[in-house]
Every structure is written in C-alpha cells, then in structure tokens.
C-alpha cells in the first residue's frame, strides 16, 4: 500500500465524531503503513477517542467550530510533508492513499481531492438525503470551477491529500 516516500513524510488526519463503530478498524488498516495517524475528535459522546488511542492513533480535540477548523487542528498537530485527510465513517478506502498522494510525490500537484463521481465509491447509493447531497456537491463544483477555472468533480469530498506548504 505504501508508496515510495520516506517514513514520516506522510501524516494521516482523520476527523471523527461519534464514530466508535469503525474508528478502530480504520486505524488498524492504516497503522502498518503510516507512522503518524492523528484523529481530531469532535467532542464525541461515545468511545471514539478511547478506541482511536487504543488502535494506535494520537487523539486531539477540535475546537468545535466545524470540519474546516478540525482540519486546521490536524495540520497543526502533524509533522508530515504530505497530509492525507480522511473521514472516519469508512467512506474512504485506505488502499487508495498511494493513488491520491502520487501527483504530490511527482510534483504534479500540491493538493489532490478525491471524487465520489469518478467511480469506486458506494457513498452515493442511498436515499433522498444522499441524492440531495450529491446534487449540492455537483452544483458547488460547477460554481467553483466557473469561478477559478478549475476542473473539480467533487469539492465537498473529505478524502484529500496536500503538501504542507499548500
């Protein structure tokens, strides 16, 4: 699973809130490949933080101001040159980390955003709420692409990788 980067170069940041059901499995799947795994806990009411620590992650509390701020906490708390951001709900496959960091390693990008619209995601299977979320993400992607002349397909996806300097 691990790409050709040196140990300690990649930090995995997981934003979590009330994810006790799967956080341990996610961290266990990452631990053999990545040394620095930080869970930014959104003041969970369940055992998310304890289970994350038990699985080998370092846990820090977010400041309660939303996911963007939780990402900032994770960035401050990690040391890697490349930071991988994942949701704790199991919607992102750790086996895809080498693919998402490759453009950064090859100096082709400073930021890579995963896309649920490119295939391989089962997150869009579901009810009306899921459909509305997909429509909102699509609309926002169109607006951002028009404004910044980019070619993004899923700007709201939490599976990302970024160079620290970005």
Predicted regions span which residues?
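Active-site acidic Asp-centered loop
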Residues: 42, 86-88, 113
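N-proximal low-complexity "stem/linker" segments adjacent to membrane-targeting elements
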Residues: 1-29
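A conserved acidic beta->alpha catalytic loop
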Residues: 41-49
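Acceptor/aglycone-binding surface of glycosyltransferases and processive sugar-polymer synthases
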Residues: 63-65, 69-77, 95-166
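Donor nucleotide-sugar binding loop of glycosyltransferases
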Residues: 19-22, 44, 67, 93
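A short, conserved beta-strand element in the Rossmann-like catalytic core
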Residues: 43, 91, 117
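Acidic donor-binding/catalytic loop of UDP-sugar-dependent glycosyltransferases
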Residues: 47, 86-103
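Short aromatic/hydrophobic "clamp" motif used to bind/position activated sugar donors
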Residues: 83
């Amino acid at each position: 699973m691990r790409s050709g980067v040196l140990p300690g170069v990649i930090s995995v940041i997981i934003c979590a809130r009330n994810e006790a059901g799967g956080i341990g499995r996610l961290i266990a799947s990452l631990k053999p490949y990545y040394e620095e795994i930080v869970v930014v806990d959104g003041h969970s009411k369940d055992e998310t933080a304890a289970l994350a620590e038990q699985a080998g992650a370092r846990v820090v509390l977010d400041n309660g101001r939303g996911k963007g701020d939780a990402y900032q906490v994770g960035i401050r708390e990690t040391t890697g040159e490349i930071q991988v951001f994942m949701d704790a709900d199991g919607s992102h496959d750790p086996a895809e980390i080498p693919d998402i960091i490759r453009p950064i390693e090859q100096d082709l990008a400073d930021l890579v955003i995963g896309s649920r619209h490119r295939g391989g995601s089962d997150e869009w299977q579901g009810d009306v709420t899921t459909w509305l979320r997909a429509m909102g993400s699509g609309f926002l992607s169109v607006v951002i692409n028009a404004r910044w002349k980019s070619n993004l397909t899923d700007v709201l996806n939490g599976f990302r990788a970024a160079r620290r300097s970005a």
